[in-house]
Amino acid sequence: DHVTIADLAADILAKSPDRFALVGLSMGGIVAMEMMAQAAERIEKIALFDTNPLVELDEVKQRRQPQLDAVKQGRLRDVMRDEMKPNYLSKGPRREAVLKTCMDMALDLGPEVFIRQSHALMDRVDQTKTLKNIDVPTLILCGRDDTLCPLSRHELMHQLVPHSTLDIIENAGHLPTLEQPETTNESLRKWLKH
């Protein structure tokens, strides 16, 4: 019984206020785009950070299966260490602390959540049409050094969303909220005032 991105989006919408501003990072951005697809009239503004509007590539799906097998065998720590490779993050003084935070979060959530989220990511739908239809203030933000969801994906989203703002965070990879929190928060503040 797999949970889909659509299921996750519907669950969050059911627990959310009638109107709200929405921010999504990485998989959270994928869920945020689906929330926009399901209930655009409820979302006052949207910010998409280090995310991907496209379906998962076959080669990425193929890489996930050995990870899922390893996690089922009790090797979540190994998979996270290998998957979170430091190259997801920019080189910088916060790198080790950010990696530790990510590892702690993964271990706290546990293998079932990793497996559920992996399946949801594998089965996600293309959101380019959703992006073209967005008509609220939109911030698209990414770390310049993000190799998981590269700048080119964010440039595509910026082209698709009319009147969007694209902010590129220097000295940050996939997690600018943790790698460069001050700069990221400044972008968020500007977007919230818009």
What is the role of each PLM region?
Residues 24-28, 32:
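Gly/Ala-rich beta-loop-alpha elbow adjacent to hydrolase catalytic centers
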Residues 163-194:
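Catalytic active-site module of serine/aspartate enzymes centered on a nucleophile-bearing elbow/loop
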Residues 56-62, 75-133:
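Conserved alpha/beta-hydrolase catalytic His-Asp/Glu region
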Residues 21, 44-47, 132:
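Residue in the alpha/beta-hydrolase core beta-strand immediately N-terminal to the catalytic nucleophile
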Residues 5, 37-82:
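Flexible "cap/lid" loop of the alpha/beta hydrolase fold
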Residues 136, 150-159:
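Short alpha-helix in the alpha/beta-hydrolase fold that links the catalytic acid
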Residues 1-23, 38, 186:
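Active-site loop/oxyanion-hole signature of alpha/beta-hydrolase fold enzymes
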Residues 134, 140-142, 146:
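Short beta-strand/loop motif that positions the catalytic acidic residue
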